[in-house]
């Protein structure tokens, strides 16, 4: 039987299968390369882009343990048939469909996004008997503005800040969110500086058919009229003596009234790589 339990990842005890285990396992399926879904497994199944991201984040020794599986292909693990389907979350992100010889099926949808994105494959939703899904924005108040409105808000913030002689600094997670932001800035023909972690991951996007714009390496000593894109985790590295600047946090949590004060930024912009409440309902 496919009866899932949560034990630091999704576990199917009747067949011994781990998905997105956060501690190393002999074998696991990895839905995508965000750090809260990966570990240094002895062997793991993932899409080729996810394995390439893991190579950058965890090293070549870990990546070599990866078994690449393209979307919609089948991998047999003991008696189980495993398939991966695009989750729309970030490049290479996958939903995991597991089927037993008797035809019983389970779909594990880790992190996913239902809206079309600029830096990820569009979502595909297969049928299954049992669904296990995320609910990051699972409350009715989480209704995002139209994507075009959010994109325009990002561009307006950057242009207004530059016109005021200041440096716009966009805080965006280095895998997924940052790349979508870069595509938005590229379409607006804005000059970009990006942190080295973002630039390294950009190479994987380009290798897998999503070219990223040219960016200058982030140099706090030379911020001349550039839009800076960097992960929020390194915010403390911003020198105190850089030119006047404004900070924007790019996150779906921007919908919360307290977000700007919690993130201590000048503004918050609700671009998310997770499905909102209505997207979760649509998925079901």
Which residues make up each language-model segment?
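His/Asp/Glu-rich metal-coordinating catalytic cores
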Residues: 2-12, 16-23, 27, 33-171, ...
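Metal-dependent phosphodiesterase/nuclease catalytic metal-binding core
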Residues: 95-284
